[in-house]
């Protein structure tokens, strides 16, 4: 069973990726976008379409020595130079990457500024989704790169360098380029045995009904000041993309008060669950410090995952005022099958400082799932530019992060 540390299909739909709060990305280079016209599964995918520029997104990792991942990629126009799809920056030594050969249209492994592996057997075509599985291993004195394209393995490529650690994963090129590249269905693990992760997709689950509140009177309210309980909570925090038009706020101190929402069930055709990531969009009335908490559970809060703060150790939600949204995310503990996915709930509130009021803008759970090879992902894998050849070759979506160039 895959043990992810980060996953995304970009299903939160934030059109302009942001580092606000660190919940989505930690570093962004250039102006990538998240769009809905071309995707592998679900409703959204990342687009990297620089014009003589570098567009890359980075997600920090907790200094692992092995990074395993899967992503889906699709070129709408070719890279003009040899450039990365995904790479990992290391604490010492040279970075490890998987790049496209701009001449042959094939992928190859690369140790930055040092050496390149042979081209993969697969010649890529435009407007076609491919699955990239990869493993970067810097745990010993021999660094190793393994990868597959649609299940066809490349020869392992190695380099003698001291054991080190990885700081992040980067998706996108490190060199200035003009191209159009789509990325979807990213899963990242730090467990060597998870390679290859294989075919899959991503679905967004949103709050679909109210649970059992302890909202108090004039404590947990909607954006209009109506008490939660007198009005529904779930439909105030279930927008994609996130919107501050509606939200839940805590208007008075109440460390035991909260609003509870239940997420909808997974509907995508799948054979297993890889994992789930809870995402919070939040802000505050002003930027003066305050408190709040967001927790999620798959067993009615016998256990919980802290998305941001918890009922006893609340977190500051005052990063920005209502003109800006901020994001936190966490991998949901022990969400591993349909039973746990379909039981997901969230609670928001618990504040001991409501000056200014904390605002819960939106909640979403991204669920990564397994599909049987040869079965299409659930939704909308066809776009206006697809050809019959592209459709027959289609599969489903994976990821990577650094600041130097190669």
Indicate where each model-derived feature is located.
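Secretory/extracellular carbohydrate-interaction modules
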Residues: 47-107
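Short tryptophan-centered beta-strand motifs in secreted/extracellular beta-sheet-rich domains
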Residues: 127-138, 145-147
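Extracellular carbohydrate-recognition regions
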Residues: 1-24, 184-228
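Intrinsically disordered, compositionally biased repeat/linker segments
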Residues: 205, 209-222, 227-232, 245, ...
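Short, aromatic/His-centered strand-loop micro-motif at the edge of beta-sheets
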Residues: 110-131
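Extracellular glycan-recognition surfaces and repeat-rich motifs
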Residues: 14-45, 94-95, 217-244
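Flexible glycan-contacting loops in extracellular carbohydrate-active proteins
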Residues: 157-182
């Amino acid at each position: 069973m895959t043990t992810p540390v980060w996953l995304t299909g970009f299903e939160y739909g934030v059109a302009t990726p942001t580092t606000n709060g660190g919940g989505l990305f930690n570093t962004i280079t250039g102006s990538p976008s998240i769009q809905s016209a071309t995707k592998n599964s679900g409703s959204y995918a990342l687009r990297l379409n620089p014009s003589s520029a570098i567009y890359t997104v980075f997600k920090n990792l907790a200094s692992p020595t092995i990074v395993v991942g899967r992503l889906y990629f699709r070129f709408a126009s070719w890279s003009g130079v040899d450039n990365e799809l995904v790479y990992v920056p290391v604490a010492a030594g040279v970075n490890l990457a998987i790049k496209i050969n701009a001449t042959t249209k094939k992928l190859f492994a690369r140790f930055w500024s040092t050496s390149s592996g042979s081209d993969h057997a697969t010649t890529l075509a435009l407007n076609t989704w491919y699955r990239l599985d990869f493993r970067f291993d810097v745990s010993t004195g021999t660094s190793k790169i393994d990868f597959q394209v649609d299940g066809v393995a490349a020869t392992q490529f190695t380099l003698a360098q001291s054991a080190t650690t990885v700081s992040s994963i980067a998706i996108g090129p490190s060199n200035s380029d003009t191209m159009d590249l789509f990325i979807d269905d990213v899963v990242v693990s730090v467990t060597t045995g998870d390679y290859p992760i294989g075919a899959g997709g991503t679905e967004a689950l949103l709050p679909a009904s109210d649970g059992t509140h302890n909202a108090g009177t004039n404590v947990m309210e909607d954006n209009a000041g109506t008490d939660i309980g007198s009005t529904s909570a779930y439909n105030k925090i279930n927008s994609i993309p996130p919107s501050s038009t509606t939200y839940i706020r805590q208007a008075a101190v109440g460390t035991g008060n909260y609003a509870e929402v239940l997420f909808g069930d997974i509907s995508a055709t799948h054979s297993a669950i890889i994992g789930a990531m809870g995402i919070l969009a939040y802000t505050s009335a002003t930027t003066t410090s305050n408190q709040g908490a967001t927790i999620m559970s798959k067993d009615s809060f016998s256990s919980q995952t802290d998305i941001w703060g918890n009922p006893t150790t609340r977190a500051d939600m005052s990063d920005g005022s209502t003109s800006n949204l901020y994001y936190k995310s966490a991998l949901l503990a022990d969400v591993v099958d349909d039973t746990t996915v379909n039981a997901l709930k969230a609670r928001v509130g618990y504040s001991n400082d409501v000056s200014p009021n904390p605002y819960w803008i939106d909640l979403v759970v991204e669920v990564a799932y397994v599909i049987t090879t040869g079965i299409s992902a659930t939704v909308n894998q066809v776009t206006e530019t697809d050809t019959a050849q592209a459709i027959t070759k289609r599969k489903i979506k994976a990821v990577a992060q650094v600041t130097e160039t190669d």
